[in-house]
Amino acid sequence: MTARAFWLLCLIVGSSPEAPVAERKTSPPHSRKPDSRGCPSAEETPGPRAQPLLEAPQRPRAAEVAPAARAWPDPRRRKPPPPADNQASFREAARAPAGPPGPRLAQAENRASPRREPASEDAPRRARSRALRFPAARPPALATEGSAGHAHPNRPRAAALAPGPAPAPPPRFSLSFGLSPPQRDAEPGAEPCARACRSDLDEREAFCESEFAVNGIVHDVDVLGAGIRLVTLLVDRDGLYKMNRLYLTPDGFFFRVHMLALDSSSCNKPCPEFKPGSRYIVMGHIYHKRRQLPTALLQVLRGRLRPGDGLLRSSSSYVKRFNRKREGQIQGAIHTQCI
């Protein structure tokens, strides 16, 4: 009884589920070894044998799946495609031989790509665009060759230039960083006007022939009519070169001097010219009652011109911008005797 229980225990231990089933099934009979515990195997055990336990159905492993089942892989476990090579040489080598262009290739022809044409046939893109933009800046031979060559795929073909005289060069920039003013035709009466307004007398002659000589800043200019202006100068003590009976009105540090400027010329530019805020050297005559003025002029003035005010005529007066050179010549004329 004891031996039979011992053999039954060995049989139960040998057929327990902890042992690998595949190993028990696949191992051949000649490779089986006796149990290390000294228990003989089930085949060698005499007497009744125990029935093998029923095993639960197991899922087939991924390695044991038939090759036919791999035709429909799981899309979620699909392997990502291999990364594309960025080298142009490998892509070009893997391309298929050239055939008739498809619709997508014909549509892609409208894109500008530097690989469409070899670099040896045409100049670089910048030189080609500059040549198309300014055809007059290059020689005629190059202009004709560039216009007849293959046009850029993204630009319309330039029209052929009509044979004729070369177009005018682009305007040049002067040193003042601006465009040079256009040369306009001189007006027919511009030269006589400039000649009539320019005084032929120098500072010394004008000083001797005038009745007053001052330099001052133009305060205001009142235009009463065509060729009739009332000018107010602010003169300091150093600017009174020659006074005689010139009427002065004190105004703080300066003296106010009123003058009537008459322009007998029919020019667009007033003569003499006075700009408010500018400093001028003025030499002319003094108005008094003995000097008769036209009745129409007196009606326009309406008492604004008083005796002692200056009287400037375009032909017998001296009006020029102030500078140190002219002032020095007038200072020298003060100490000389007029003939």
From Swiss-Prot:
Region (Disordered): 17-191
InterPro entries recorded: Netrin_domain (IPR001134), TIMP-like_OB-fold (IPR008993)
Record's keyword annotation contains Translocase: no
Record field: compositional bias (Basic and acidic residues): 21-36, 112-125
Any coiled-coil regions, as ranges: none
Disulfide bonds: 193-267, 197-271, 208-338
Keyword match Signal: yes
Keywords per UniProt: Disulfide bond, Signal
Family recorded in the similarity comment: Belongs to the UPF0450 family.
Protein name as annotated: UPF0450 protein C17orf58
Organism: Homo sapiens
